[in-house]
Amino acid sequence: MTTIGIDAKRIVRNGTGLGSYGRTLVNDLIRMGDSQLALRLYAPDEGREELREQIIGDGNVQFCYPTGHPSSLRKTWWRSRSVVDDLVEDGVDLYHGLSGELPMGLRKKHIRSVVTIHDLIFMRHPEYYQWLDTRIYEWKFRHALREADRIIAISERTRQDIIELGGEACADRISLIYQSFAPRFSAEVKAERKAQVKERYKLPQRYVLNVGTMERRKNLALVAEAVELLPQDIHLVAVGRQTDYVKELPHDDRIHLLNGVPDSDLAAIYSMAEAFAYPSRYEGFGIPIIEAIAVGLPVVACTGSCLEEAGGPHSLYVDPDNVIEMAEALKMSLRGARGRDERIRKSREYIRRFEGNDVARQVAQLYQSLL
């Protein structure tokens, strides 16, 4: 039996982003059905029950927490240092940090390690972060590079950034393994379910969808302004955590901002949209693009980072500062537009490379290569 320890903080706390990556990867590994692989998920606390419950029940999977009722400071210390003692006690053979960081002391305890690095936006674009946060993230990144036996980059863009900003010496330890998407996004959503979700969120009849944190880097204003140039019955629905950035969006009754939407409702919201817009200025990958394509939506994204890797050659890409380009691309993506259905079909073929069984197999092979 091989025991893999996994950093589960984001799995139990984050509804989207890093949390989705972790839950999807763990479930993909479970679906492989390898009876000789045991997963131990290490989290500083139990987090959100509805997120823990998304992990498929399996006898070879177990959540692990610090003992007692530690303070926030002790939880941080446990995750960054003393969790290593628990790994030794639990007989962990390899530890996987899912969010770009690793605890201190793994090498001293002879525990092999893998770290997934999603992006280096805090180094490429520090203007989007607080100064102290940037310093902390950079320290964690450089520590992970020193500590990790292997590094997973979730996109070619991220792989190149790691080499450029972390040094050529780490290049031979990097594996490019894309992230996958949850199976629920490729499953048909029943009409009754759509009706329930539409009523719950008071969704308009026709809308362009955006999913992601509403912050400056995500550039939602570009889509909001573009929608004003579309027919009057086309609305914008944006789903995600809101920041002060939303105050800069146009005041328009065709703009609907949804916060706190559970994962269980997302597929239905995707399925009722006419197009998906992802105008982010910089990403490590862009998993919402794949989710949208899996549901069957045409995608319009922006140039400048790595979104072409996620969306493939049959999505549309525009300048992140050009409202007219975004509006024209969205017009080409509405129901009835010429070539729309063919673009959707070819895009769905493209994202087959991101299916969970292939991703899990690559990650499992990486684990085995270190043991």
Regions found by a protein language model. Give the residues of each.
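Carbohydrate transferase catalytic cores enriched for Leloir-type hexosyltransferases
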Residues: 1-371
